[in-house]
Amino acid sequence: MRPYYIAIVGSGPSAFFAAASLLKAADTTEDLDMAVDMLEMLPTPWGLVRSGVAPDHPKIKSISKQFEKTAEDPRFRFFGNVVVGEHVQPGELSERYDAVIYAVGAQSDRMLNIPGEDLPGSIAAVDFVGWYNAHPHFEQVSPDLSGARAVVIGNGNVALDVARILLTDPDVLARTDIADHALESLRPRGIQEVVIVGRRGPLQAAFTTLELRELADLDGVDVVIDPAELDGITDEDAAAVGKVCKQNIKVLRGYADREPRPGHRRMVFRFLTSPIEIKGKRKVERIVLGRNELVSDGSGRVAAKDTGEREELPAQLVVRSVGYRGVPTPGLPFDDQSGTIPNVGGRINGSPNEYVVGWIKRGPTGVIGTNKKDAQDTVDTLIKNLGNAKEGAECKSFPEDHADQVADWLAARQPKLVTSAHWQVIDAFERAAGEPHGRPRVKLASLAELLRIGLG
């Protein structure tokens, strides 16, 4: 019996979790064999683990060791630098595989939709994070970090990452895998204050406690919260929201009780505040902030309502971190409102053999580990459908050398195709470059350099 040929488009956590689930199912199920091909638009795998997780969070990045173990399986192949929708089309993949899983994530950002948002100095967190993580698509972002104050819009972990990177001592960052160009820009330490702005209150903030607590470890940085921001919030209020919220409020109160120290840089939290307008002649110079109040919608949820109160704050950099958003893949359905591919249980609506996992399936929610169960759920649906196809004599017929034919086809469509062997060359090069400096790796930040090293 031939193996089932499965393609996975994307190579982030949800993609690798799906691959691991497929291979495990083959190991534990009689008469079930799998051959998994992973297609990635970049020459490098791991998705946001490589290009999204902050460089000063190496423990989170260590999950890549699990991915490496999956990639070592002889039933697994990696093909990088191939763009689905450009080099190959979804319909062509569906013809050549028994099933195709799309794990393409949420590659865009949500806009603020306010005047001045397009001024130089106003950028999306997805761009800024990609820039300091050496994602080749964001090499040219080059934000101006010479100003004294930055404003980060958003109350999630990504907003904390951005603020922390802006204020962390560059000598500390120099021991991480941060992009060299980002380290060079951060070295002058021009930014003295980062203001984190959230439209709702502390009870509604989406930070995780670990991320919030570690801010206390920033050398030479004060975390500043006006005690009035926490007035009226009881332990019972926080506990009613959840355990994480209760812990967060405790941490925030600790920061609010501290006295700022002279000469320290500042990370300032502002709640119940929304951006109204970004001002400047040729670049960001000021931001207009509006004060909000919380109102109930009658169903137990609260929303931020503008009070009409305004404040103008000098700022030279504005980073919007109000959420990621999926983008359409040519040839696949797309729900523009949610930024996801419509599906039922992971199976794409109207398709017999196409599936989704991760953020493109459910939206940009949860942490890396959330994708594990999400991927397993989709794989369970996929395997069940494969069994139904087999029983109904709908199983595809492929020649014995089908895997070789697919590899040749991909190489013909993309002559600069990156294989697992090529990626291993890139990986070894980056690690070797970092070793003399006590860094885990020095990332290659341009597509041209990645291909030059990988392909030789």
UniProtKB/Swiss-Prot annotation:
Residues bound to FAD: 14, 40, 48, 84, 359, 366-368
Keyword Oxidoreductase set for record: yes
Cofactor annotation: FAD
Keyword tRNA-binding: no
Catalytic activity field: 2 reduced [2Fe-2S]-[ferredoxin] + NADP(+) + H(+) = 2 oxidized [2Fe-2S]-[ferredoxin] + NADPH
Enzyme class: oxidoreductase
InterPro entries named in the record: FAD/NAD-bd_sf, FAD/NAD-binding_dom, Ferredox_Rdtase, Ferredox_Rdtase_adrenod
Pfam families per the UniProt record, alphabetical: Pyr_redox_2 (PF07992)
Gene3D superfamilies in alphabetical order: FAD/NAD(P)-binding domain, NAD(P)-binding Rossmann-like Domain
EC number: 1.18.1.2
Keywords: FAD, Flavoprotein, NADP, Oxidoreductase
Binding positions (NADP(+)): 110, 155-158, 199-200, 211, 366
Source domain of life: Bacteria
Coiled-coil region: none
One Gene Ontology term of the molecular function aspect: flavin adenine dinucleotide binding
Subunit: Monomer.
Annotated family: Belongs to the ferredoxin--NADP reductase type 1 family.
Job description of the protein: Transports electrons between ferredoxin and NADPH. May supply electrons to P450 systems. The enzyme can use both NADPH and NADH as a reductant, but the catalytic efficiency is two orders of magnitude higher with NADPH.
Entry protein name: NADPH-ferredoxin reductase FprA
